[in-house]
Each structure stands twice: as C-alpha cells, then as structure tokens.
A protein has these predicted regions:
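Non-catalytic, surface beta->alpha helical segment in thiol-disulfide oxidoreductase systems
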Residues: 89-128, 132
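Bacterial N-terminal signal peptides
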Residues: 5-14
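Thiol-based oxidoreductase modules, predominantly thioredoxin-like and allied folds used
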Residues: 53-68
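Local sequence-structure signature of Cys/Sec-based thiol-disulfide redox active-site neighborhoods
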Residues: 21-53
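Small-residue-enriched transmembrane helix starts and helix-helix packing motifs
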Residues: 157-162
Length: 162
C-alpha cells in the first residue's frame, strides 16, 4: 500500500506539473457529481477538440485507489477539504465548476500559443460552434487526448513488465 501511495503521489505531482502546464488539464471528478459532468463535457468534449496540443487527464475520486493522488492534488492546491470537481490547469486550481471557468482556461491556453496556433484554435472553435458532431467525427483521434487515470494500473504495470 505504501508503494501505491508513493507512486500515486509522484504521479499526482507529475499530472499537475506535466510538460507545459498550459497543455495539460487534470479533472478530479465523481461520476455522481452533476457539476463534474458539466466540467468534463466542456473540457474533454470541447476544449480538447479546440486545442490540438491539449491533453486532459480525468481522475475518478470515487475509486479508492485514486485517493492518494486526489489528496496530494488538494494539498498542492492549498485546499483544506475535498469536493469535486477539482480542475488543475497551469498553476491554477479550481474547485467547483461553472461555464465561466471555460473562458479562463481558454485564456490560459491561448497565452502560450503563437499566432498560427491561435488562428487554428479560433478556426476549430468556430467549427465546433457550427457543427460539433461533424467536427468531432472528423477529428475522432482527439478522443485519445483524454486519459483516464488509474493508480491501480500504475501499480500493476511494473509487475506485468516482469
């Protein structure tokens, strides 16, 4: 169990500080939380299609194996108690969700883009507004940019490699 906690803590830190902070969003959610559904729909179902370099990691906090990772994220975010969703993007942490956060995330993501990338994102956003289903169908590979975190899979991976 200590090994799992240690691995989860390390992975939790790497999720928060991964590569370029503006290219990674981590959502800590519960399947029974209505605001989590809104957050996941907007981020995993919209932003990931608008921003070709965005990766979204979703962490189901109702899975006990993911508890240490969630607790580490709360600690790093300076949150004293739980609650979901918790959304980590860049150096920002948000607990709860409203559509207003979507604009803030776009602003943060846009800050690291060059003009060509901004033009592409604007074009993608317009296409999503015109016909999201058609755009998603043409860009189905973007579904791979949404990762489901599993602490148990991380713990089992070294054993399977042997």
């Amino acid at each position: 169990m200590k090994k799992l906690s240690f691995l989860s803590a390390i992975l939790g830190l790497s999720l928060i500080n991964a590569a370029s902070a503006s290219e990674v969003i981590t959502i800590y959610y519960s399947p029974s939380c209505p605001y989590c559904h809104y957050a996941r729909n907007d981020i995993s179902g919209r932003l990931v299609y608008e921003y070709p370099n965005l990766t979204v990691t979703e962490v189901d906090v109702s899975n006990p194996d993911n508890g240490p990772t969630y607790l580490e994220a709360l600690k790093r975010c300076g949150l004293k108690s739980g609650g979901v969703p918790v959304i980590v993007y860049g150096d920002k942490c948000e607990r709860g969700y409203s559509g207003l956060l979507l604009d803030g995330m776009r602003e943060l993501l846009n800050a690291s883009l060059n003009e060509e990338e901004k033009t592409l994102v604007a074009s993608n956003r317009k296409a999503m507004e015109e016909d999201a289903d058609a755009f998603k169908a043409r860009n189905a590979d973007r579904k791979k940019a949404v990762l489901q975190f599993s602490a148990k899979a991380i713990e089992e991976a070294p054993a399977q490699a042997q």
